[in-house]
């Protein structure tokens, strides 16, 4: 079975309310949050106040491997100043995502991965089997997270369409350099 495994939430509506707030949030976009803070300061349904700043963005290709590095610091109004580096390494049949968060004081770090609604999860020892149509299409392992949970989410593939789905929540409590890594191998 072919198809997406991970998605962002999409946009369901522009009307004020909980759904509009959710689809604009960091939680809906496969990024890191620290102490629940957003990467950008969101105002109302359409406006953004202080914005996160990208410090580094690079792509390195060597043989069959590509490495994408992004480094962002959130907006200036966050409670604790932090910096997030994400390194995505693409192999022919695998992807690894390393999140490195530099945070000066003990903080709750959370990384989310939104699943496509057609993807189901089975826990197999320390791995997750990612399934589509009852067939395992990939295996995922996690390094460095204190907890891993599946949380309810919503996927909005088109305007006005809301489909229940799940997101994988990785959490770690810490200070200094906090790292969590996800390895995904196709089957």
Regions flagged by a language model, labelled:
Residues 11-187:
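CBM-like, beta-strand-rich accessory domains located in the C-terminal region of large
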């Amino acid at each position: 079975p072919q198809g997406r495994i991970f998605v962002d939430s999409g946009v369901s509506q522009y009307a004020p309310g909980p759904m509009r707030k959710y689809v604009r949030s960091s939680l809906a976009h496969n990024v890191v949050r620290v102490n629940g803070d957003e990467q950008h300061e969101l105002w109302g349904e359409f406006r953004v106040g202080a914005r996160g700043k990208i410090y580094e963005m690079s792509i390195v290709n060597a043989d069959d491997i590509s490495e994408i590095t992004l480094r962002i610091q959130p907006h200036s109004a966050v409670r604790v100043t932090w910096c997030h580096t994400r390194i995505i390494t693409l192999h022919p049949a695998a992807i690894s995502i390393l999140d490195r968060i530099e945070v000066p004081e003990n903080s709750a770090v959370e990384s989310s991965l939104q699943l496509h609604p057609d993807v189901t999860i089975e826990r197999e020892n320390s791995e997750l089997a990612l399934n589509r149509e009852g067939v395992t299409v990939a295996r995922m392992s996690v390094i460095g997270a204190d907890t891993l949970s599946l949380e309810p989410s919503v996927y909005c593939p088109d305007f006005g369409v809301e489909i229940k789905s799940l997101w994988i929540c990785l959490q770690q409590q810490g200070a200094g350099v906090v790292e969590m890594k996800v390895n995904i191998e196709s089957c």
